């Protein structure tokens, strides 16, 4: 009964219609049920059945006839019933020899918290510790030392080349950060041998997985809730990400001069992204959160969401020589130093940790995360630069140059001409994330995670001049010349041929089978207007005008 239950309320999320767990059609999945020295793993295959008359839409749960909505029937044989495997883990807590480290919101770590009702009056009941692996020097007094037990991650042997080498390279970047924290080869990445199960809690793993559609890669961990000690890191990398990056490069570069070649720059571009992705998700599993701070020092963290950096040369060609970063970032070194440095006996740890963050602030190396991106132009995701309006204009220039060159060279010989649309979509929306970043300056505020006594400026409003510059840049995205798809592109896109039906990576259309030339403009313009007039942004604008009429 414990295993044959809907522990995560999956039935409530299955659409369209209403689903119910059928225990008579469910069973224990023995292939993923096992026991290891420190953990027991159990899995059940649960079957959910669509209830009669619950609004399935007549297509067995495939979205009620709407091809743009993918319901249960898009991933199951039919939407009438679907089986899901649900996994349960029982993990032994570690020994009591680990020493937790205090949480600081400026340090970039996730926290574990609990209420301690025994603390003296005047001290906070909420205890906060960072999440991190246990790591100790063999020689604590040495400036550089090997670890008593290094942190080792094992890559899924099912990962194919050249992706395998790229993932190994990216994950290994973290050893640079641990070296900066005083360790020698304390962070290692190896291929997982057959003798090690990915379910064994004694080993950190990087899994390579497949999905029916693009989805997030993740970096999770099993953490001791008492101390924040990470017991096991689990990275899950989706195999479709690299395909999307490949297609983005095809749209921007239109690289198929003859149509039958395989331009090496496409793989180089995509593999550079995969190296960064590997480092990013591993970073989560060693305790770190996203860092979206727009630093004057440039790309400071692999914990950012990186947008491909493509520059426009004076002759109109595109420069992608620095499309993604190739090393660990300066912030990443600061964060690992904060979380993992072992101090000699007698050191005032709190003072040393605060000093690390103070030195980093002097170099404009700070931490801002997910909750900040909509409110301040100091932090954004999928963006480059640190002046949001200037960067949006630069990206619009790159987009315009690529659109002028875009054509049949964006697809290979033998591909249906209609499939040009797939490469056109990311090119036409090349600026979409920078629109969000630029809108954050409008009604925006600037702030830090200031602590009393650290001397930081807690809060100020974005200047009127900067807000107006951001609005000007956003208005450019609404100009007809930017929204209109050039005629030389429209003339290349026929209706979809048999076997190449509509799917989620295409623009919506209201023109039957013919390509709809208007809806891309509606999509792009709506994107800008929706972010510009977002409810909380509008409220801040009203407030700012009331507080400062100038």
Label every model-predicted segment:
Residues 191-210, 272-327:
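The catalytic-center signature of Zn2+-dependent metalloproteases
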Residues 172-183, 283-284, 308, 432, ...:
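Sec-exported extracytoplasmic/periplasmic mature domains
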Residues 297-550:
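Conserved catalytic/binding loops enriched for acidic/polar residues
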